Amino acid sequence: MYPPKASGDPAAGAAPVTGFPVGGPAASSQWSSGLLDCFDDCGLCCLTCWCPCITFGRVAEIVDRGATSCGTAGALYAVLAYFTGCQWIYSCTYRAKMRAQLGLPETPCCDCLVHFCCEPCALCQQYKELKARGFDPVLGWDRNATMLPPSAQGMGR
């Protein structure tokens, strides 16, 4: 009903910010889950094992900040998987991009080897990392992007 009292700190009422840092590279941090923690989320694990193109598409859309849609990335992943079996090369580039954006270490080994040896585990780990950072990959980039609240409007006739 009443506006909050002003304090000396201009950031006192600011909402916490999640997602990708703006500007330079992120400070170094750790993965929120291990590579083999894919079985912690049974639904995600099943989706990724049976339809990895969906999990990959969702991750790619968030990592590309909406420049690539989930459908486009997922379809390209599926075509590469079906015709060449080398979809892991495509998906490892997104792991590298995500690590650079979030300041994550290249563990347990190089990105391409992680995706070559255990593609479903790598995709689950990336998906779970985005969720831990405040994104909901199901919603896509547009619905995850921060929007300003509507301005207060006066009474109209």
UniProtKB/Swiss-Prot annotation:
Residues passing through the membrane, by range: 41-57, 66-83
Membrane topology: Multi-pass membrane protein
Cell location: Membrane
Chief location bin: membrane
Tissue: Expressed in roots, leaves, stalks, immature ears and silks.
Cellular component, GO, one term: membrane
Superkingdom per UniProt: Eukaryota
Keyword Signal set for record: no
Keywords annotated in UniProt: Membrane, Transmembrane, Transmembrane helix
UniProt xrefs under Pfam families: PLAC8
Record family assignment: Belongs to the cornifelin family.
PANTHER family cross-referenced by the UniProt entry: DUF614 FAMILY PROTEIN-RELATED
Identification of the protein by name: Cell number regulator 10
Source organism of the structure: Zea mays (Maize)
